[in-house]
């Protein structure tokens, strides 16, 4: 029998019989690897263990410890769930069921709604099917054969998918009596699906189109073992406890109202104070770094949006209004007014770089189905800046922004990850401009000394970019800072400066945000801190609590003194038990409760008590002011 040569990840070569599969290769390396293998990579493509090898292929064996393992496990768990649903609810029609970042889902068309009790039944049946150790097999059928197969099963959604693929052949995966249209790959048998949990039910339109039929989506998750699953479920419970929508109500920070409109935030006094603190912090930090604060109008003429390209490419996400028979666009971003500021004067190379910063409120039409508390809204404020500089200044400006981001993330206690997205196939601008911008971004990233990923071809059509994702207390990733080079707007708006040689040249433009949308960042902060904001960020830093009504006059004087000193303080002078008032303040996550009783009134002091129950020594009100100033001095 002839043999073929296979390249392994360590660079070694291995001879194996022609016609062998990836499973055969794993077995030839060792019994332990054969047992651990769940899939393979053939020339960089994730495939089943049953895939036949080719000569001179590069092969990697995927085990449960591999980064790609969860994708395969979760995809197979989605099929297992669909199989269980079909057995328990034969009338259900299956549609699509992919693996996603945190688990998997499957969409079903069924008249009767699924209930929480149904999820328990489905999960129990999944466990039985997994224990049955059914072999998962892949077949390649002609499209006509596949249409015949799924038509016979009454699965009209699968028939629609096959017809839309317009391919000569398709792959079908089977386990027991269940078959599904799928590219794979999958585990070799159902017994390899060992730890899973069904989580929730939601609605979803077929193919994401609101004009199509509403389906029922079941979400679940799966892991390699029960320990990992339990850890994830614990994090999930913790994320529910930290949910900013719940905490926003409980802490009286913000609300939404159908009478006002979907995705439009109403900030209550404490939420507005939190936002004000954050915005004041942003202004100070930008001024320290040489930015000029600017403000643009909320609406701009439609012709300006046409000139910028937004009308052509972004119109569906914009809101428009008519004023004196003139059409205006409500701004979805802040850049156009900044362009007009630049154009208001003839610029010299000596003026550059110019850094325009605006806490600009924008409006974007997001579909109702994707709105989510503060994290996805229709009206929001960005810490938006545009840097206009000479090409030779670009490298230094990018490094400055990355240092800015690093400083700010450290203040809030966030770790973060960075990604560089390079030129896509469809792009504008000449090669030299792209090379200059990409090299500047790459150089700045390397200069940080931190690791980063490169997403080849994932940049915007008008320039490369750096995306920065922060990691919160639950190790979740959130997009925040972005640094984006733009070759389009300087060209469209004919931005120029007079260079040292007297020639007019085009400046380089950088869009950048540090926190991103203020609303979204506050939502992330609420969940990161679980509402326990650090002292400098807390909308209420201290709560004065009296023991009896006799202490109210003294407490009123202390309240006024603290407010005059700039402390954000409130008073609870109700005729309630002290323990009740302290508990109320703790539930509101106020950092300090200042107890005032006979002893404090006689000695003209207050007794601070931290929200975790720890008491400080009694002190004069002015000493408490000094204490707060010292604790927050780095953020004022």
UniProtKB/Swiss-Prot annotation:
Its EC number is 6.1.1.3. It catalyses: tRNA(Thr) + L-threonine + ATP = L-threonyl-tRNA(Thr) + AMP + diphosphate + H(+). Keywords: Aminoacyl-tRNA synthetase, ATP-binding, Cytoplasm, Ligase, Metal-binding, Nucleotide-binding, Protein biosynthesis, RNA-binding, tRNA-binding, Zinc. Residues 1-63 form the TGS domain. Residues 243-534 are annotated as: Catalytic. One of its GO terms (cellular component) is cytosol. Zn(2+) binds at residues 335, 386, 511. InterPro entries: aa-tRNA-synt_IIb, aa-tRNA-synth_II, aa-tRNA-synth_II/BPL/LPL, Anticodon-bd, Anticodon-bd_dom_sf, Beta-grasp_dom_sf, TGS, TGS-like. One of its GO terms (biological process) is threonyl-tRNA aminoacylation. It comes from the Bacteria. Its cofactor is Zn(2+). It is an enzyme of class 6 (ligase). Disulfide bonds: none annotated. It holds the Pfam family tRNA-synt_2b. It is found in: Cytoplasm. Binds 1 zinc ion per subunit. NCBIfam families: thrS. Homodimer. Belongs to the class-II aminoacyl-tRNA synthetase family. Catalyzes the attachment of threonine to tRNA(Thr) in a two-step reaction: L-threonine is first activated by ATP to form Thr-AMP and then transferred to the acceptor end of tRNA(Thr). Also edits incorrectly charged L-seryl-tRNA(Thr). This is Threonine--tRNA ligase. It comes from Pelobacter propionicus (strain DSM 2379 / NBRC 103807 / OttBd1).
């Amino acid at each position: 029998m002839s043999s073929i040569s296979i390249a392994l990840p360590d660079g070694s070569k291995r001879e194996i019989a022609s016609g062998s599969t990836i499973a055969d290769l794993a077995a030839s390396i060792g019994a332990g690897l054969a047992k651990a293998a769940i899939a393979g990579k053939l020339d960089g493509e994730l495939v089943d263990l049953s895939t036949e090898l080719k000569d001179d292929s590069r092969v990697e064996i995927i085990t449960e410890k591999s980064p790609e393992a969860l994708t395969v496990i979760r995809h197979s768990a989605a099929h297992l769930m669909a199989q269980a649903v079909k057995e328990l609810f034969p009338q259900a029609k299956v549609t699509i069921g992919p693996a996603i970042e945190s688990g998997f889902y499957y969409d079903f068309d069924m008249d009767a709604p699924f209930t929480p009790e149904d999820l328990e039944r489905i999960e129990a049946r999944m466990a039985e099917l997994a224990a049955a150790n059914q072999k998962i097999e892949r077949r390649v059928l002609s499209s006509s054969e596949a249409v015949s197969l799924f038509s016979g099963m009454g699965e009209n959604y699968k028939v629609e998918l096959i017809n839309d693929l317009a391919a000569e052949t398709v792959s079908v995966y089977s386990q027991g009596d269940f078959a599904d249209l799928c590219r794979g790959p999958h585990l070799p048998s159902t017994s390899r699906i060992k730890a899973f949990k069904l989580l929730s039910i939601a609605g979803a339109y077929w193919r994401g189109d609101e004009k199509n039929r509403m389906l029922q989506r079941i979400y679940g998750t799966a892991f390699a073992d029960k320990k990992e699953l339990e850890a994830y479920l614990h994090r999930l419970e913790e994320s529910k406890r930290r949910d900013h929508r719940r905490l926003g109500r409980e802490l009286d920070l913000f609300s939404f109202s159908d009478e006002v409109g979907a995705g439009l935030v109403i900030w209550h006094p404490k939420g507005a104070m939190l936002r004000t603190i954050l915005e004041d912090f942003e202004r100070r930090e930008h001024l320290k770094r040489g930015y000029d604060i600017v403000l643009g109008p909320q609406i701009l003429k439609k012709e300006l949006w046409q000139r910028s390209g937004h009308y052509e490419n972004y119109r569906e996400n914009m809101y428009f209004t008519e004023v004196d028979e003139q059409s205006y666009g409500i701004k979805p971003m802040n850049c156009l007014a900044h362009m007009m500021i630049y154009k208001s004067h003839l610029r010299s190379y000596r003026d550059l770089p110019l850094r325009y910063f605006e806490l600009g409120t924008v409006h974007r039409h997001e579909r109702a189905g994707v709105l989510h508390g503060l994290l996805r809204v229709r009206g929001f404020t960005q810490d938006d800046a545009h840097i206009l500089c000479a090409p030779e200044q670009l490298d230094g400006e990018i490094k400055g922004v990355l240092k800015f981001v690093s400083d700010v993330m450290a203040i809030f206690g966030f770790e973060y990850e960075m990604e560089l997205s390079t030129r896509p196939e469809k792009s504008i601008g000449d090669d030299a401009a792209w090379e200059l911008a990409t090299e500047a971004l790459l150089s700045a990233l390397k200069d940080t000394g931190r690791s980063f990923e490169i997403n080849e071809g994932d940049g915007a059509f008008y320039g490369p970019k750096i995306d920065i994702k922060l990691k919160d207390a639950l190790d979740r990733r959130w997009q925040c800072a972005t640094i984006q080079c733009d070759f389009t707007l300087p060209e469209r708006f004919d931005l120029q400066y007079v260079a040292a040689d007297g020639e007019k040249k085009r400046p380089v433009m950088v869009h950048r945000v540090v926190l991103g949308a203020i609303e979204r960042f506050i939502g992330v902060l609420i969940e990161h801190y679980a509402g326990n904001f650090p002292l400098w960020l807390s909308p209420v830093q201290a709560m004065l609590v009296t023991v009896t009504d006799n202490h109210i006059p003294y407490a009123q004087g202390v309240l006024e003194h603290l407010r005059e000193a700039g402390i954000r303080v409130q008073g609870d002078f109700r005729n309630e038990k002290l323990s009740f008032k302290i508990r109320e303040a703790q539930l509101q996550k106020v950092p300090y409760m200042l107890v005032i009783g006979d002893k404090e009134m006689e000695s003209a002091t207050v007794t601070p008590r931290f929200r975790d129950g720890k008491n400080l020594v009694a002190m004069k009100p002015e000493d408490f002011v000094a204490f707060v100033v010292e604790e927050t001095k780095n953020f004022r």
